[in-house]
UniProtKB/Swiss-Prot annotation:
Biased amino acid composition, Basic and acidic residues: 173-186
GO cellular component, one term: ribosome
Pfam families linked to this entry: PRC_RimM (PF24986), RimM (PF01782)
Domain PRC barrel: 93-168
InterPro entries (UniProt xref): PRC_barrel-like_sf, PRC_RimM, RimM, RimM_N, RimM_N_sf, Transl_B-barrel_sf
Any one GO biological process: ribosomal small subunit biogenesis
Keyword field: Chaperone, Cytoplasm, Ribosome biogenesis, rRNA processing
PANTHER family: RIBOSOME MATURATION FACTOR RIMM
The UniProt record lists the keyword Repressor: no
Gene: rimM
Protein name: Ribosome maturation factor RimM
Protein purpose: An accessory protein needed during the final step in the assembly of 30S ribosomal subunit, possibly for assembly of the head region. Essential for efficient processing of 16S rRNA. May be needed both before and after RbfA during the maturation of 16S rRNA. It has affinity for free ribosomal 30S subunits but not for 70S ribosomes.
Complexes and interactors: Binds ribosomal protein uS19.
Alphabetized HAMAP family for the sequence: Ribosome_mat_RimM
Length: 186
């Protein structure tokens, strides 16, 4: 996906037989989904929403209205994007859009050792996480919290990471007190 496209929402399941669909908005105010102009899908088609009720919309694709349930079903999980330049500029140097993090270097807080590069920002509703691609090709997921990512420096092109410490899990076959729990030790 291009950094010039910003994901604002997704088309959900159809509603009724006349082409209406449920729409999930990733904006703070769902009405903002249409405030920035025409939306696009990943194929580049222009999508216009006509809100009918809370989270329910009629859809027009490239000027053609969706008028039946079958056509609406084919749109399920279609992601809705806008062009980056349609967003207002950030007002404060400490503000940024999550897409601005993609491509930044990820370094450790302790000694600024290079961990890798932010490849993607994931947000599934419970909080964002950064996918960091390491030089060996393996990825690392870090929760995007102030504790785990205390420094975001867009101008310097980096984020500083303080990875969460992993808890010591009990040895398989033993509980926390060291007693045999009936499992087989590997």
């Amino acid at each position: 996906m291009s950094r010039d496209l910003i994901l604002l929402g997704v088309i959900g399941r159809p509603h009724g037989v006349r082409g209406l669909v449920h729409v999930v908005s990733y904006t703070a105010d769902p009405d903002d989904l249409t405030a920035y102009g025409l939306l696009h899908d990943e194929a580049g088609r222009q999508i216009m929403l006509d809100w009918r009720a809370d989270g329910l919309a009629g859809i027009t694709i490239d000027g053609v209205p969706v008028q039946d349930r079958s056509a609406a079903e084919r749109l399920t999980n279609t992601r809705l994007f806008i062009n980056r330049d349609a967003l207002p500029p950030v007002e404060d140097e400490d503000d940024f859009y999550l897409v601005d993090l993609i491509g930044l270097e990820a370094r450790l807080v302790a000694d600024e050792t290079l961990l890798g590069q932010v490849a993607q920002v994931h947000d599934y509703g419970a909080g964002a996480s950064l996918e960091i691609t390491r030089s060996g090709g393996a990825s690392l997921l870090v929760p995007f919290t102030r504790a785990a990512v205390p420094v975001v420096d867009i101008a310097a092109g980096r984020v500083l990471i303080d990875p969460p410490q992993e808890e010591n899990a009990p040895e398989f076959g033993r509980n926390e007190l060291g007693h045999d729990d009936g499992g087989e030790a590997a």
